[in-house]
């Protein structure tokens, strides 16, 4: 009996050690899978934070490039925060050029109109994300009215920019801005503005777009 008991204890101890090893392996694998799954989210959050800091530091161009790089991955395109930071980056570029023009400092006027064009593109894209139904099939628009009212004040820059590039004989850019001006009339984002019935410049914008 004295010889049997140590044998039993050894067997039990070995079984406990095996179970403990299996448990640790499972925990390790679970932790590893969790890390792999969450790593992209942490990296994305870090890039967004860095882009915000870049905008404040006067590096809006770099911030825009960073956010567009994120959006190149379709997995990120439903992240509203990326679109909002991207818009802030483009808006800051517009404001910087506009301020220089106001102060009569040397600047590239074309950059103002190009930034205005990109502002519309960003918020129109965000609107399509905003309009997606939730898991219950409901659509809750958080940004549409606010962004439509905001961009309405800048829309004239698309028309003015089209005319500017037309006079410069830069026809591709002229067409791009006139087309964006016209397209607002059919964008769900601007439904409340009723451009199709209220905007008397639409026919001339269409004419200049064809001319471009």
PLM segments and residue spans:
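Targeting/processing segments of secretory and organellar proteins
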Residues: 3-6, 12-15
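Leu/Val/Ala/Ile-rich N-terminal alpha-helices, chiefly Sec-type signal peptides and the beginnings
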Residues: 47-50, 54-56
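Alpha-solenoid helical-repeat scaffolds
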Residues: 152-212
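Sec/Tat signal peptide C-region and signal peptidase I cleavage site
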Residues: 38-43
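Sec-dependent N-terminal signal peptides
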Residues: 26-36
């Amino acid at each position: 009996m004295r010889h049997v008991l140590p044998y039993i204890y050894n067997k039990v101890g070995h079984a406990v050690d095996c179970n403990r090893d299996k448990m640790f392996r499972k925990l390790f694998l679970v932790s590893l899978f969790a890390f792999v799954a969450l790593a992209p989210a942490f990296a994305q959050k870090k890039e967004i934070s860095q882009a915000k800091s870049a905008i404040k530091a006067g590096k809006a161009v770099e911030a825009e490039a960073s956010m567009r790089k994120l959006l190149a991955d379709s997995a990120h395109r439903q992240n509203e925060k990326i679109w909002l930071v991207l818009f802030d980056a483009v808006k800051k570029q517009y404001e910087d050029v506009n301020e220089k023009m106001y102060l009569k400092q040397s600047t590239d006027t074309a950059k103002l109109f190009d930034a205005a064009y990109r502002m519309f593109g960003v918020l129109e894209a965000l609107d399509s994300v905003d309009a997606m139904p939730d898991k219950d099939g409901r659509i809750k628009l958080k940004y549409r009215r606010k962004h439509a009212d905001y961009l309405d004040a800048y829309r004239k820059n698309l028309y003015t920019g089209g005319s500017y590039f037309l006079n410069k004989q830069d026809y591709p850019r002229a067409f791009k801005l006139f087309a964006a001006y016209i397209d607002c009339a059919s964008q769900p984002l601007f439904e409340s503005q009723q451009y199709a019935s209220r905007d008397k410049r639409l026919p001339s914008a269409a004419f200049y777009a064809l001319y471009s």
